[in-house]
Amino acid sequence: MITLIIFSFLSFLLGIILSFTAYKFRSQEDPIVAIVNELLPQSQCAQCGYSGCYPYAKAIVENSEKINKCIPGGTDLISAISSVLSIEVPEKNLIITHKKQKNNTVLINESNCVGCSKCASFCPVDAIVGAPNFIHTVLQEFCTGCNICLLHCPTNCIEIKKETYEE
């Protein structure tokens, strides 16, 4: 019984020490980075050149990165970020930075699809639909062309067809 009381007291004391340490050494996140991150589409597609939306938001705020690199966000996102950061964006900069737009069409080869649902579970925008053990399909209007589904398909039945055209 005394052992139980001693361990309970030590656990309580250790909990207080840990909570104090966590409070004292907490990291200070820039609130503007959080606001810009909330504006981004959170598709984690890496088309901007960063590994995800949070690193891109951090680069926009801290390193003055261009705000027109997010292809899924489009011109509405550029306007929203410019209003949050109180910067003027000339009309010519409202165009996404890539000279050639890539229109990716994602196709699932139904003869090779085993219905494992790995592609659907990793799709950041839920553009792949289908039930487990059944053939899946891609909703093209929601697909951002991030290629994450390609990495997780065990049968390599997903194909990306890239169409490139001048703006």
UniProtKB/Swiss-Prot annotation:
It comes from the Bacteria. [4Fe-4S] cluster 1 binds at residues 45, 48, 53, 70. Keywords: 4Fe-4S, Cell inner membrane, Cell membrane, Electron transport, Iron, Iron-sulfur, Membrane, Metal-binding, Repeat, Translocase, Transport. It is an enzyme of class 7 (translocase). One of its GO terms (molecular function) is 4 iron, 4 sulfur cluster binding. Its EC number is 7.-.-.-. Binds 3 [4Fe-4S] clusters. InterPro entries: 4Fe-4S_dom, 4Fe4S_Fe-S-bd, 4Fe4S_Fe_S_CS, Elect_transpt_cplx_RnfB/RsxB, RnfB/RsxB_Proteobac, RnfB_subfamily. The keyword Membrane applies. One of its GO terms (cellular component) is plasma membrane. Residues 1-22 are annotated as: Hydrophobic. [4Fe-4S] cluster 3 binds at residues 123, 143, 146, 149. GO terms for biological process: electron transport chain. Coiled coil: none annotated. Its main location: membrane. The complex is composed of six subunits: RnfA, RnfB, RnfC, RnfD, RnfE and RnfG. This is Ion-translocating oxidoreductase complex subunit B. The gene is rnfB.
